[in-house]
Amino acid sequence: MVLVLLALLAATAPFVAPYDCLASQGILNAKNLSPSLDYPFGTDQFSRDVLSRVICGSRVSLSIAFLSVLLAAAVGTVFGAVAGYLGGWLDALMMRTVDALLAIPRVLLVIAVATLWDGVGIAGLIWLLGLTGWFGVSRLVRALVVSAREDEFVTAVRGLGASDTRILAYHVLPQVIAPVLVAATLSVGNVIVIEAGLSYLGVGVKMPDASWGNIISNGLGDGNFTSTWWVWLFPGIALMVTVLAVNLVVDGLRQALSARQLPAR
């Protein structure tokens, strides 16, 4: 429920935010105001309403997370399915490639590419996080496909003359969807944290666009840890609640998947 509300908030951010996310509220009289009835989350050093920026930041952060995870799941599923179904030397080559890529720490790889590719932007960040996040999914899918292709039902369908493409699309991949959904949902929380870290370091979402990471960075900059605590605290709470909600959804999906796999009595 919390995750659904956050998604709705992100989708309607421009209409729900009480003020323009980028506009100041008056440089002279609204700078670094503490939380009040007019500005429930206070304002920052540029006289921007923090509540509005947190709401707009949810749209950016969640969009990056969901779209990059969707991209990673799609690439990983196709790669792992091809490797697992065809097998042989191609499977070995593809999996050794994945092993080599997994040996590179993802965060360091993303930081290096984002730093070299200055001004990566929101779209570039989605591609970057998506194309560095499919390795684990491909291994999971490959293992599931190897198991599924040996099922008696799949063997029978193959004996009836069904093509490999049809077998893979209609009889093997449907068995993979649920575990991939769990893995992808778990990745959402990780990607949100990675994006926030990149934006905090200045190599992710650039100002004046708002993401939770760069709002926190803005609040902690110039020694403002205690003097303007509201600027970093509220986006930090939003980040924590979102990651917690994602993890709870993952636990629910795992329990549902485990219940489906239990033998009938």
Pin down the residues of each PLM region.
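Generic hydrophobic transmembrane alpha-helix motif, especially the helices
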Residues: P40, D44, V50, L71-G76, ...
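Conserved glycine-rich helix-kink/hinge and helix-boundary motifs of the Major Facilitator Superfamily
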Residues: R96, L168-A169
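Alpha-helical transmembrane segments
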Residues: P14, W134, S138, S187, ...
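Glycine-rich helix-loop "coupling/hinge" segments at transmembrane-helix boundaries
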Residues: L102, V113-W117, V145, L186, ...
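Short coil/turn motifs that cap or connect alpha-helices
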Residues: V78, G88-W89, S163-D164, S187
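Hydrophobic alpha-helical segments of membrane proteins
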Residues: F66, L70, A74, V78, ...
